[in-house]
């Protein structure tokens, strides 16, 4: 099971989301924590300026950006649409 840390930037963006989206985010984080290779999350490595970060899908539009701190620990950095990648 992954240990998850939440950066202040992630918490701020999460708190700005609608309550229904917050619930969806919580569900996907639970899936990610218990099975980080879950196919429906579409976990993938980012490129370019974000090359040391990864992302997984909350839904068709929303992504969570994270980075590995160790094999069993990640830090969630941001949540939002594809503008996160800019």
What does each model-identified segment do?
Residues 1-4, 8, 12, 23, ...:
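Enriched for short, Lys/Arg-rich terminal
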Residues 9, 30, 44-47, 63-65:
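Residue-level detector of intrinsically disordered/flexible regions characterized by low predicted structural confidence
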């Amino acid at each position: 099971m992954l240990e998850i840390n939440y950066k202040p930037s992630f918490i701020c963006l999460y708190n700005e989301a609608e309550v229904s989206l917050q619930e969806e985010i919580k569900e996907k984080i639970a899936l990610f924590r218990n099975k980080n290779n879950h196919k429906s999350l579409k976990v993938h490595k980012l490129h370019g300026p974000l090359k040391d970060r990864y992302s997984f899908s909350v839904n068709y539009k929303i992504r969570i950006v994270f980075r590995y701190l160790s094999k069993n620990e990640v830090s969630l950095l941001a949540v939002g649409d594809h503008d996160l990648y800019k």
